[in-house]
Amino acid sequence: MQSSKDAIYSQPQQVSDFRFDDTVAEVFPDMIQRSVPGYNTIVDAIGQLAGRYATNNSNIYDLGCSLGAVSLAAAKYVVADNCSIIAVDNSEAMAQRCARHVKAYKANTPIEVICDDLQNIHIENASSVVMNFTLQFIDPTQRDQIIQSIYDGLAPGGIFILSEKLRHASEQGNELLIDLHHEFKRRNGYSELEISQKRESIENILRAETFEAHQTRLQNAGFDDVVLWFQCFNFASIVAIKS
């Protein structure tokens, strides 16, 4: 996935709320690589997990698919027969580019790209459902119902993979993780202005929760095992298993 370099916040500007529009979609691969520690590791491992748990004739859902990195990783590892991958994003700019990437990749496992709100998608016969840094952008009052519908749509033995930016339970710990993340971004070429303006643009729409809050929600939905399998600074990925 080739893209332009992310310079969206390189000049002083009147900062508005972050949106997944054409401007962001154009630079998204560069932005995500330079902003999320361990992103490639997370995506590849999600693909492995989807392949490991895929069963014949099942569905794999990538909710908030952006440009399709997770869907393509899953397609790479799935060997079960007659599986389908459903990639969903409510950003037309993202979904259009995702469809182009999928077409160019020519995966053996079919990938259907849908531009819609993930809450309009009926999850059924799923061996895996993935939300890779997606739930954090959804109204917290709607999150319980979303997770419950995912649990209900998973087949027994299926998994839900949830990657999120976390908020630490203590203010001191939270500030430490934020500082480490900002240093990560500096080392990846972002200026102080870019870091500050990006933080201002996203603070009203990315509402992070603690790991404990996610764990409680997943357990309340019915998941028997909740495993924190990856964390770097305040970025983490969780796999929840349905018996």
UniProtKB/Swiss-Prot annotation:
Q: What biological processes does GO assign it?
A: tRNA wobble uridine modification
Annotated GO molecular function terms are: carboxyl- or carbamoyltransferase activity; S-adenosyl-L-methionine binding
The subunit structure is: Homodimer.
Q: List the disulfide bonds.
A: none
Gene name?
Answer: cmoA
Organism (species): Pseudoalteromonas atlantica (strain T6c / ATCC BAA-1087)
Q: Does the keyword S-adenosyl-L-methionine apply?
A: yes
Q: Which residues cross the membrane?
A: none
Alphabetically list the UniProt keywords.
S-adenosyl-L-methionine, Transferase
Q: Which reaction does it catalyse?
A: prephenate + S-adenosyl-L-methionine = carboxy-S-adenosyl-L-methionine + 3-phenylpyruvate + H2O
Write down what this protein is called. Carboxy-S-adenosyl-L-methionine synthase
Classification via PANTHER family: CARBOXY-S-ADENOSYL-L-METHIONINE SYNTHASE, TRANS-ACONITATE 2-METHYLTRANSFERASE-RELATED
Hey, which family's this protein in?
Belongs to the class I-like SAM-binding methyltransferase superfamily. Cx-SAM synthase family.
CDD domains assigned? AdoMet_MTases
InterPro entries in alphabetical order: CmoA, Methyltransf_25, SAM-dependent_MTases_sf
Entry EC no(s): 2.1.3.-
Q: Where does S-adenosyl-L-methionine bind?
A: Y39, G64, C65, S66, D89, N90, D117, L118, N132, R199
Functional summary from the UniProt entry = Catalyzes the conversion of S-adenosyl-L-methionine (SAM) to carboxy-S-adenosyl-L-methionine (Cx-SAM).
Q: Does the keyword Nucleus apply?
A: no
Name the Pfam families for this protein: Methyltransf_25 (PF13649)
Q: Which NCBIfam families match?
A: carboxy-S-adenosyl-L-methionine synthase CmoA (TIGR00740), PRK15451.1 (NF011995)
